[in-house]
């Protein structure tokens, strides 16, 4: 039990966890970051089409392009789920367990994109701190993003917790 002066009480007494869960649902809905992922994939596709130092463009690597396309398909599906969820929120409904799905898939897509960037940057991604003298462009940021966004699967409730929420509330397990 926590004692709070009546002047500092927010909402009804004893409803703190209920309010916290609603706030977490909204945070998870926003964790999908589809707009950022879409921009990063578009930029990566443009970079893959360019030849670097006379080497064939990465766009000619079928395995890389297959992986890129798979992430694009996942992202497109996530965008539709996000739009449906946002439409429900706009009509006055609270985000439900789909917010867990948005967070789960959104962060996994972000990490898949970071992995593609690391693969595309090759050895230019090795420096953790950006050094303008290394690489053709922004490759050195790949490692920074890759390591920094490992946290995405932890904040707003770890992805393992999101899987449990989905199993309980969506699948009825």
Residue ranges of predicted features:
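Secondary-structure capping and boundary motifs in well-ordered enzyme cores
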Residues: 12, 60, 67-77, 94, ...
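Glycine-rich beta->alpha junctions and the first turn(s) of the following alpha-helix
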Residues: 1-78, 152, 168
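Short, well-ordered loop/turn and helix-capping segments at boundaries between secondary-structure elements
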Residues: 3-5, 25-26, 46, 50, ...
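Glycine-rich phosphate/cofactor-binding loops in nucleotide/flavin-utilizing enzymes
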Residues: 14-26, 30-34, 121-173
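C-terminal helix-coil-helix/basic helical segment that borders enzyme active sites and/or dimer interfaces
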Residues: 59-62, 76-134
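Generic detector of well-ordered alpha-helical segments enriched in charged/polar residues
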Residues: 21, 42-45, 65, 86, ...
């Amino acid at each position: 039990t926590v004692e709070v002066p009546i002047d500092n009480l927010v909402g009804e007494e004893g409803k703190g966890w209920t309010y916290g869960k609603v706030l977490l649902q909204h945070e998870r809905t926003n964790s999908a970051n589809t707009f950022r992922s879409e921009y990063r994939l578009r930029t990566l596709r443009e970079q893959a089409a360019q030849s670097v130092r006379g080497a064939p463009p990465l766009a000619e690597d079928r395995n890389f392009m297959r992986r890129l396309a798979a992430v694009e398909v996942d992202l497109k599906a996530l965008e539709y789920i996000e739009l449906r969820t946002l439409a429900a929120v706009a009509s006055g409904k609270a985000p439900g367990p789909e917010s867990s799905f948005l967070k789960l898939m959104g962060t996994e897509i972000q990490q898949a994109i970071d992995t593609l960037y690391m693969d595309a940057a090759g050895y230019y991604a090795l420096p953790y701190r950006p050094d303008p003298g290394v690489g053709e462009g922004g490759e050195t940021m790949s490692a920074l993003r890759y390591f920094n966004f490992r946290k995405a699967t932890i904040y707003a409730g770890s992805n393992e917790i999101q899987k449990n929420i989905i199993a309980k509330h969506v699948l009825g397990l």
